[in-house]
């Protein structure tokens, strides 16, 4: 087992900004002899299985209070110590947490991505690099519509309603202000390979 402490990279930004794509691109460039994992913050949505489907649809999933922060902090702290963690699995279609989990242990690079990835002081303190993805809001909306309709069993109308009522306001109130915690802000699109190269070079140099 590698005795060196794992590298924790946090990637934040608006819904639909390209956080997951950016995280995947980073991990794809990590050398094969270096173990890595991507953990999605959405896994830590509070389980609301006691509510019916209509009640769950009324929840503001874009507010910080929708996440189980204590578990999130505990597990990220443990994986930084190379301890085994059991990451919850959140089902977007049913909007509840599943009974099964994903076991993760002893990895060299942890990439944690989510809208509030750099929002929490405790998590920020144990992170090695904090990245904020900046993408125009109209592009984020287009990506979210395509994703939620095609992958999450949502209607076009419901996506637009949620964007106007919670996604955009919560971004302005909570997500965008967290940008001040970032070490790096990235203007992200599929052509911005320079940012990927620089971040991966940094990871490889300190690992």
Curated annotation (Swiss-Prot):
ATP binds at residues 13-20. This is Uridine kinase. It comes from Ureaplasma urealyticum serovar 10 (strain ATCC 33699 / Western). It holds the Pfam family PRK. Keywords: ATP-binding, Cytoplasm, Kinase, Nucleotide-binding, Transferase. It is found in: Cytoplasm. It catalyses: uridine + ATP = UMP + ADP + H(+); cytidine + ATP = CMP + ADP + H(+). CDD domains: UMPK. GO terms for cellular component: cytoplasm. Gene3D superfamilies: P-loop containing nucleotide triphosphate hydrolases. Transmembrane segments: none annotated. One of its GO terms (biological process) is UMP salvage.
């Amino acid at each position: 087992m590698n005795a060196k402490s794992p590298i924790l990279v946090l990637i934040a930004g608006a819904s639909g900004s390209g956080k997951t794509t950016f995280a995947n691109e980073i991990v794809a460039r990590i050398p094969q002899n270096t173990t890595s994992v991507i953990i999605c913050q959405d896994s830590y949505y509070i389980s609301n299985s006691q509510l019916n489907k209509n009640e769950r649809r009324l929840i503001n999933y874009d507010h910080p209070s929708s996440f189980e922060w204590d578990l999130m902090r505990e597990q990220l702290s443990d994986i930084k110590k190379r301890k085994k963690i059991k990451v919850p699995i959140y089902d977007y279609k049913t909007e509840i947490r599943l009974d099964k989990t994903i076991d993760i242990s002893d990895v060299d690079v942890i990439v944690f991505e989510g809208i509030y990835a750099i929002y929490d002081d405790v998590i920020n303190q144990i992170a090695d690099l904090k990245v904020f993805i900046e993408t125009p809001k109209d592009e984020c909306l287009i990506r979210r519509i395509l994703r939620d309709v095609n992958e999450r069993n949502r209607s076009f109308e419901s996506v637009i309603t949620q964007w106007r009522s919670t996604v955009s306001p919560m971004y302005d109130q909570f997500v965008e202000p967290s940008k001040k915690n970032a070490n790096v802000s990235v203007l992200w699109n599929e052509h911005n390979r320079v940012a990927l190269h620089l971040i991966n070079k940094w990871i490889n140099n300190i690992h």
